[in-house]
């Protein structure tokens, strides 16, 4: 008898599964006999419990297991016979109008959609490019110097000159202060501290607080009002105005290291050669620029593919991906040390839009890869592993690490497939190049 597949919508389908009751009962009896060989009950030796008692105790549970197994197998057989590409898990519901002597269930499910790929030649891509200039190397060196800054206390040589006993605090100085803040005459939680240190100009403190500290000399005090923003993280003071008193305890002036052989050695240049140091910095910046520009163009390619493709997205796959994203979010919270992160009440609904995009993109990419034979080749995977390993001290060990784990290798394979897709689309689409500075590139990718 042919199976009737009902069409309930664009992707939703339903089939009826019938199971002869005598066949189900036969399997139930067989499993209970097997169970009776090992079952334990008070007053009986193992395996000596009367079959009737085992049946009374376990028949309901065993029947449910048998029905689940048989319904699942029957659904699999029907799916294969009807060439159904089932998306996600089906739901089964018992029917009340089953033929006498049968169990009957409705299996409701979704199928994978037909993906209509658009003409890649109509896609428009803006490809970001960047060239590492000497000025960019200088800017990076300046950042590296600031990361290695040393602060000199009063009475030591510093940027402000030797001694500098009456020098006032200014931007870049590390200051140590005592402060007390009050709202309506009462000190609030977190509103006071002794020997509190921060660097002026880093933005760690609210602007009014930094402004009050700027210009003070050691031993001087100042009173000022500070209006907390409405969105301030401390809800008990958000939107309120506090009266602060601040006293300068210590001023330390920043001293940046000179760019010399010792500085180069601190960056891993063993012989301290400054030319080698600049070349190494340039190589690192070029690698980073390549990574960032590839990420930008990949996102543009994916957006373009979604724009030119037509398909319906199975809700079952969206819901599955939502659950994955919730699990990932909880794992992230756990890694950050958040208590009870595994049970955090994260609603799946907040990930629906993201999950729909991910599922849709996955279906489009699968169709594009299949249609244009863009699968990853072993030599491509090895080339990417080798390239990744170059940035490590022992590249051979990194290569072994990748090839010793199938999951890591599968992740690299997925990366290569994406790269193949990007290359394919760029070879067909309307591409315009846009030159940006490395600083602009870093800012753009940080905001993405």
Curated annotation (Swiss-Prot):
<dbReference type="GO" id="GO:0051083">
    <property type="term" value="P:'de novo' cotranslational protein folding"/>
</dbReference>
<dbReference type="InterPro" id="IPR046357">
    <property type="entry name" value="PPIase_dom_sf"/>
</dbReference>
<keyword id="KW-0963">Cytoplasm</keyword>
<dbReference type="GO" id="GO:0043022">
    <property type="term" value="F:ribosome binding"/>
</dbReference>
<dbReference type="GO" id="GO:0005737">
    <property type="term" value="C:cytoplasm"/>
</dbReference>
<dbReference type="GO" id="GO:0003755">
    <property type="term" value="F:peptidyl-prolyl cis-trans isomerase activity"/>
</dbReference>
<dbReference type="GO" id="GO:0051301">
    <property type="term" value="P:cell division"/>
</dbReference>
<dbReference type="GO" id="GO:0043335">
    <property type="term" value="P:protein unfolding"/>
</dbReference>
<protein>
    <recommendedName>
        <fullName>Trigger factor</fullName>
        <ecNumber>5.2.1.8</ecNumber>
    </recommendedName>
</protein>
<dbReference type="InterPro" id="IPR037041">
    <property type="entry name" value="Trigger_fac_C_sf"/>
</dbReference>
<dbReference type="InterPro" id="IPR027304">
    <property type="entry name" value="Trigger_fact/SurA_dom_sf"/>
</dbReference>
<feature type="domain" description="PPIase FKBP-type">
    <location>
        <begin position="172"/>
        <end position="257"/>
    </location>
</feature>
<dbReference type="InterPro" id="IPR036611">
    <property type="entry name" value="Trigger_fac_ribosome-bd_sf"/>
</dbReference>
<dbReference type="Pfam" id="PF00254">
    <property type="entry name" value="FKBP_C"/>
</dbReference>
<dbReference type="InterPro" id="IPR005215">
    <property type="entry name" value="Trig_fac"/>
</dbReference>
<comment type="similarity">
    <text>Belongs to the FKBP-type PPIase family. Tig subfamily.</text>
</comment>
<dbReference type="InterPro" id="IPR008880">
    <property type="entry name" value="Trigger_fac_C"/>
</dbReference>
<keyword id="KW-0143">Chaperone</keyword>
<keyword id="KW-0413">Isomerase</keyword>
<comment type="function">
    <text>Involved in protein export. Acts as a chaperone by maintaining the newly synthesized protein in an open conformation. Functions as a peptidyl-prolyl cis-trans isomerase.</text>
</comment>
<dbReference type="InterPro" id="IPR001179">
    <property type="entry name" value="PPIase_FKBP_dom"/>
</dbReference>
<keyword id="KW-0697">Rotamase</keyword>
<dbReference type="GO" id="GO:0061077">
    <property type="term" value="P:chaperone-mediated protein folding"/>
</dbReference>
<dbReference type="GO" id="GO:0044183">
    <property type="term" value="F:protein folding chaperone"/>
</dbReference>
<dbReference type="Pfam" id="PF05697">
    <property type="entry name" value="Trigger_N"/>
</dbReference>
<keyword id="KW-0131">Cell cycle</keyword>
<keyword id="KW-0132">Cell division</keyword>
<dbReference type="GO" id="GO:0015031">
    <property type="term" value="P:protein transport"/>
</dbReference>
<dbReference type="InterPro" id="IPR008881">
    <property type="entry name" value="Trigger_fac_ribosome-bd_bac"/>
</dbReference>
<dbReference type="Pfam" id="PF05698">
    <property type="entry name" value="Trigger_C"/>
</dbReference>
């Amino acid at each position: 008898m042919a199976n009737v597949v009902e069409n309930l919508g664009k992707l939703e389908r339903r089939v009826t599964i019938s199971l002869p009751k005598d066949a189900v009962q036969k399997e139930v009896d067989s499993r209970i006999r097997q169970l009776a060989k090992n079952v334990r009950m008070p007053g009986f030796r193992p395996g000596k419990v009367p079959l009737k008692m085992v049946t009374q105790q376990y028949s309901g549970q065993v029947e449910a297991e048998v029905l689940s197994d048989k319904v699942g197998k029957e659904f699999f057989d029907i799916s294969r016979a009807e060439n159904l590409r089932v998306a996600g898990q089906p739901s089964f519901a018992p029917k009340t109008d089953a033929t006498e002597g049968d169990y009957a269930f409705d299996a409701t499910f979704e199928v994978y959609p037909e993906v209509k790929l658009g003409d890649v030649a109509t896609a428009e891509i803006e490809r970001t490019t960047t060239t590492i200039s000497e000025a960019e190397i200088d800017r990076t060196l300046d950042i590296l110097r600031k990361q290695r800054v040393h602060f000199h206390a009063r009475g030591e040589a510093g940027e402000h000159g030797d001694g500098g006993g009456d020098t006032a605090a200014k931007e870049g100085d590390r200051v140590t202060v005592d402060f007390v803040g009050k709202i309506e005459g009462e000190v609030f939680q977190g509103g006071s501290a002794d020997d509190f240190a921060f660097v002026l100009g880093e933005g760690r403190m609210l602007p009014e607080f930094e402004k009050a500290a700027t210009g003070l000399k050691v031993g001087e005090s100042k009173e000022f009002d500070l209006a907390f923003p409405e969105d301030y993280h401390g809800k008990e003071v958000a939107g309120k105005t506090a009266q602060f008193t601040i006293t300068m305890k210590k001023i330390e002036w920043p001293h940046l290291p000179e760019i010399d052989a010792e500085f180069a050695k601190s960056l891993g240049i063993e012989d301290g050669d400054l030319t080698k140091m600049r070349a190494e910095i340039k190589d690192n910046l070029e690698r980073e620029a390549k990574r960032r520009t590839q990420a930008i163009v990949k996102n543009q390619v994916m957006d373009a593919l979604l724009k030119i493709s037509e398909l319906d997205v199975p809700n079952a796959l969206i819901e599955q991906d939502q659950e994955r994203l919730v699990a990932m979010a909880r794992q992230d919270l756990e890694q950050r040390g958040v208590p009870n992160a595994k049970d955090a009440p994260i609603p799946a609904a907040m990930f629906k839009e993201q999950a729909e995009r991910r599922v849709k993109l996955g279906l489009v990419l699968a169709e594009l890869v299949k249609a244009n034979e863009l699968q990853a080749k072993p030599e491509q995977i090895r080339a990417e592993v080798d390239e990744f390993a170059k940035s490590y001290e022992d590249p051979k060990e990194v290569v072994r690490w990748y090839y010793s784990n199938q999951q890591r290798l599968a992740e690299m394979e997925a990366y290569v497939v994406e790269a193949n897709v990007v290359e394919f689309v760029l070879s067909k689409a309307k591409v315009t190049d846009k030159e940006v500075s490395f600083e602009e590139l870093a800012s753009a990718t940080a905001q993405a």
